[in-house]
Amino acid sequence: EMFACTDATTDENVWTNVGAGTGDVAPYTFQGTSYGYAYGGDQQPSPGAINVIDKYSYVSDADATDVGDLTQASYGAAGQKSSTHGYVSGGRIGGTYYNTIEKIPFSTDSDGTDIGDMTAIKYSPSGQSSSTHGYTSGGYTGSYTNIIDKFTFAVDADATDVGDITLARQGSTGQSSSTHGYTSGGYTGSFIDIIDRFTFSADADATDV
């Protein structure tokens, strides 16, 4: 195989195969190109926690549609995505906390499936995604936690503890670049403005950037 760069957009190069063999090298697009999804949540004043999977188009402005159900109604979960599936990890309903990891396919409208567990029950962690793994950082387990959990997209399996963010907290926002995950803000008895960064290339603690 031989590849030529056909799009030199910064951080989004596309390399096209011009030799023998098949397959081109396209950029990893975190947010997807066709649809957005919303999983679960807390609907007030009733019925409370829900298990609905909503899907909405990026192509046209329109309402979301209900395309499936999670295995467990919950709110305060983290979200991750691979190129083929969306993931929901953790969450709670009332005083019950969850450590489950659910997977939802993008190719068909269907229910989620339970494919593994995080290392601990977690409410309100933040979610990050590389091209190969999903991450949850921080959260609340009965006390604030600083654990970074990592699970693979290649097989259905439990997460492993691969490091710590700099400060245990819940309610942070998660962001992802092609090389790093970020945990920003949060609450640990008071609101904080810390931005933590951890690398996808190695299992290590986050740093305050």
Q: Predicted regions span which residues?
A:
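Polar, enzyme-active/binding microenvironments
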Residues: 1-209
